[in-house]
Amino acid sequence: MIKGFRCKETEKLFLRRRSSRFPAGVHRIALRKLLLLDAAEKLEDLRIPPGNRLEKLAGNRQGQHSIRINDQWRICFRWSESDAYEVEIVDYH
C-alpha cells in the first residue's frame, strides 16, 4: 500500500487528477502502475507483469526501488514491510 508521496504531482495523478508535469501519454499507464503499487502486499508482487522491470536502485537512490512506466519514466519508491513510501514519478533521461 502507498503510505506517502515524495512528489505532490505524483499524488495528484494517483488521486485521478491531471498533472501538467507529466506528458498526457504517461498519465494512463502511470496511474495503472501506481494502482499496482498500492495493491502490492510484498515487493515481489511488483515483478508481475514482467514489463514493470522491478529494480533495486543504487548510487544516490540507494534504498529505493523502481518500476517502469515506459523507456523514459519510472516510479521510484522506498519499500518497508508491506508498504511503499516516498513514491515519485521520475524522468530517467
Predicted feature locations:
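Conserved phosphate-interacting/catalytic interface
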Residues: 37
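A short, surface-exposed loop/turn module that caps and links secondary-structure elements
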Residues: 41-65
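Glycine-rich, flexible loop/turn motifs
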Residues: 1, 9, 18, 42, ...
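Generic structural signal for well-ordered secondary structure
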Residues: 3, 27-30, 46-50, 68-70
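Amphipathic alpha-helical interface surfaces
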Residues: 6, 30-33, 53, 57, ...
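Arg/Lys-rich, positively charged N-terminal/basic patches that mediate binding to nucleic acids
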Residues: 1-33
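Enriched for short, Lys/Arg-rich terminal
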Residues: 58, 65-93
